[in-house]
Amino acid sequence: MLIYSDIITGDEIISDSYDLKEVDGIAYEVDCAMIEEGAVQVDIGANASAEEADEALDDGVVKVNNVVHSFRLQSTQFDKKGYLVYLKGYMKSVKNALKEQGKSDEEIKDFETKASAFAKNVILAKFKDWEFYTGESMNPDGMVVLLNYREDGTTPYVVVWKHGLKETKV
């Protein structure tokens, strides 16, 4: 299995156990699902019929997004201006990380061009529809994972920056 971690913070962001679809050579989209968390049934062997009226307890069932829950992503908020400031700094950090990895100037220029187009045409075009998540460490310099819903309005998906991930085999 491959775990993809943020190259800046080291936070685990996604794994190949989810179906990663590359988009425009710059990002990965991953379809998610809402799952129920909690509600553990414990049978202690008591005779339920001999007990008094069944106590109605809140069993703590919570619907959570499987990717957000599995990788302990933390919700955060941005306005458009704040996100642009963050994105500029983040892209500079990724560019520096790519240089450290020995990527060519051509590859880095390609990254910058594609990232700019993706941010403008995909993220900013529908900015109000996105939800934002940081990695577990909540480091403000790290990747912000984007969550949105497909056209059906019920299927969530996340978007992560391809070049901001480090692959680790486990």
Swiss-Prot record:
One of its GO terms (molecular function) is calcium ion binding. Residues 1-170 form the TCTP domain. InterPro entries: Mss4-like_sf, Mss4/transl-control_tumour, TCTP, Translation_control_tumour_CS, Translational_control_tumour_p. It is found in: Cytoplasm, Cytoskeleton. SUPFAM superfamilies: Mss4-like. Keywords: Cytoplasm, Cytoskeleton, Microtubule, Protein biosynthesis. GO terms for cellular component: cytoplasm; microtubule. The keyword tRNA processing does not apply. One of its GO terms (biological process) is translation. Its main location: cytoplasm. PROSITE patterns: TCTP_1, TCTP_2, TCTP_3. Involved in protein synthesis. Involved in microtubule stabilization. Belongs to the TCTP family. PANTHER family: TRANSLATIONALLY CONTROLLED TUMOR PROTEIN-RELATED, TRANSLATIONALLY-CONTROLLED TUMOR PROTEIN. This is Translationally-controlled tumor protein homolog. It comes from Neurospora crassa (strain ATCC 24698 / 74-OR23-1A / CBS 708.71 / DSM 1257 / FGSC 987).
